[in-house]
Curated annotation (Swiss-Prot):
Protein keywords: Signal
Signal sequence coordinates: 1-23
Origin superkingdom: Bacteria
Family in the record: Belongs to the UPF0412 family.
Keyword Cell cycle: no
Record-given protein name: UPF0412 protein YaaI
Pfam families, sorted: DUF2541
InterPro entries assigned to the protein according to its UniProt record, in alphabetical order: UPF0412_YaaI
Gene name, Swiss-Prot/TrEMBL: yaaI
HAMAP family hit by this protein: UPF0412
Amino acid sequence: MKSVFTISASLAISLMLCCTAQANDHKLLGVIAMPRNETNDLALKLPVCRIVKRIQLSADHGDLQLSGASVYFKAARSASQSLNIPSEIKEGQTTDWININSDNDNKRCVSKITFSGHTVNSSDMATLKIIGDD
């Protein structure tokens, strides 16, 4: 009887851990080195097209100034969406979640994300980390 209880408890704990791991589905999509001069063609191409509901941006090294961002979806019409992003991200700072792919009926997968911006207050290139949540 004791072994049956132990097995049942172990299975219950395993299921709780499994579900907890699935609930936090954040993935590092990529990192972009930001040049010191304003550039409008910085692209993060996703090698595997994936459905991404929202993203976070983080400045890992140096301060960033951003002037725009767009998400491109794999679709027959090459659909895209402009993102509302903060104009500055300080080193070590992470943005709130930025919602994308709001069309719940037609789950489109993201093929690339483009950024316009540059490094500020640093002689080194800052890095922009993009985290996705599906």
